[in-house]
Amino acid sequence: MSQKRIAVIAGDGIGKEVMPEGIRVMDAAARQFGIDLKFDHFDFSSWDYYEKHGKMLPDDWKDQIGGHDAIYFGAVGWPDKIPDHISLWGSLLMFRREFDQYINLRPARLMPGIIAPVVRRDGTPRQPGEIDMYIVRENTEEIGRAHV
């Protein structure tokens, strides 16, 4: 069984709350499929890091996380403490640009047992399999256009 290394960056706010549960889910799935996961935790991209260092990321951030198989990122932004342009430009958009994460791909499927808010023309509910699509969003340009 090969090991997969995951860089874990909780960030701020809800990220710190949900990351432990997300890791539990990944661990359970990995056991089910015979995958060995190793989680490396990083404290940057957070208010705490910014308060101590005056920036969101260390100079060698890409070297620290670049060799991992995946990055598991919680949340960025705490407008009461750090202006959005600093937290976004200082971390999240850096990750997206440096690792060429230009697409935000979101599957949308109607699952069994879920009543869809989208109905047929006659008003009857849609059934599983009738809604199966992907939403594709550009992940780096919207906010970053003025800074290119």
PLM feature spans:
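Anion-binding alpha/beta catalytic cores of soluble intermediary-metabolism enzymes, centered on
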Residues: 1-13, 31, 46-147
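N-terminal phosphate-binding or glycine-rich loops at protein starts, especially the Walker A/P-loop
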Residues: 2-40
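Short loop/turn motifs enriched for small/polar and acidic residues
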Residues: 42-44
